[in-house]
Amino acid sequence: MLRKKTLRDVDVKGKRVLVRVDYNVPLDEQGNIVDDTRIRASLPTVEYLLDANAKVILMSHLGRPKNRDPKYSLAPVAKRLSRYINKEVKLAPDCVGEEVKRIVNSMKEGDVVLLENLRFHKEETECDENFARELASLGEVYVADAFGTCHRKHASVYLVPKFLKPAVMGFLLEKEITYFEKAMVAPQRPVVAILGGAKVSSKLEVIKNLIRRVDKLFIGGAMAFTFLKAMGYKVGNSLVEDDLQDVARDLIDVAKKLEIKLYLPVDFVIGQEVSENTPTKVVPWQEIPDGWMGLDIGPVSVELVKEIISDAQTIVWNGPMGVFEIDKFKHGTIEVAKLLAQSSALTIAGGGDTDHAIHKAGVYHAFDFVSTGGGAFLELLAGKELPCLVNLDDKEA
């Protein structure tokens, strides 16, 4: 995958460099940035370009606006970024059009312009060729650095690098791909994957791919109940995808054939409904009564995870172990985060909920790498090619 060229492979001095960043940051009701991790993640690329005296043109989307909606403006992002790089970041009034061309053409070396929200134009998500050509005309070099949208076939991600050459990876994208390859392509073994989340359907391709690549796989979260029911156990009112029973049985068989150790939780914290006020108790996996549902993994399962990862050299984690937004049911997820943080293995985690849980556990810095992409991270784990890489320049053999 890293046969793609990176920023270090091209001359950017004095050039207009068009960078697709991911500034899709959460905002509160007043339009203030709640978490600027994604802005900070782009700094190595932006600062490298400034050091090289490039003219830096940044483009991103924010949210899912139906049309031009001021509440989705990138203005707060321009302000925050300028604080980090200690220079003015000019917010263009749009991302295409005559006024934008004029602003870009009058840039001096070391200037930074942030184009307004790409999704103010439906052509972005429609992957429209003319829109992509217009964006491409703004730059002399294209840099892909928006891992969070890498799995989307959108104009700025997929088509612009087709029309604007050279087209290379920025440092964030390079880092994401490098760590993924360390975990999945040429890993130190044993490799352990820990998967959580609610639905098998959303992780099906991931499970199918991982079963062929890892040595041990632990499936937690509500996904576990679909597997337990497929094995003939009662799971009370726990969330189950009945249409995936056969698929779950097949996956269990594949794991057996490949001699991959597939683990499920051995106890659960159960409640009568998904709420802070529900009564709770801890029961072994085969004793969930009718009218109750599993909402977190129990303490014995946490010990099981500890045992599973004890000899691991590489650990990949995606998805919470329970309904961790509710305090009563966050314990399993928080404890797993802490266990991985203490491990000497290479630890890589990804996915919005997972990222949130690691922050909640206060162990973010103890992980080797936490991916900035949710969907893109899952696509990689599922063994799929990312649209954002397709049209980038290949390194010479």
Swiss-Prot record:
Query: Which UniProt keyword terms apply here?
Result: ATP-binding, Cytoplasm, Glycolysis, Kinase, Nucleotide-binding, Transferase
Report the subcellular localization: Cytoplasm
Q: Which GO terms describe its cellular component?
A: cytosol
* Residues that hold ATP according to the record: 203, 294, 325, 351-354
Instruction: Please name the GO terms that the record assigns under molecular function.
Output: ADP binding; ATP binding; phosphoglycerate kinase activity
Which pathway or pathways does this protein act in? Carbohydrate degradation; glycolysis; pyruvate from D-glyceraldehyde 3-phosphate: step 2/5
**Looking at the keywords, is Hydrolase present?**
no
The subunit field of the Swiss-Prot or TrEMBL record says: Monomer.
Q: Which HAMAP family does its entry note? A: Phosphoglyc_kinase
Q: What is this protein called?
A: Phosphoglycerate kinase
Q: Which organism is it from?
A: Aquifex aeolicus (strain VF5)
Gene (UniProt): pgk
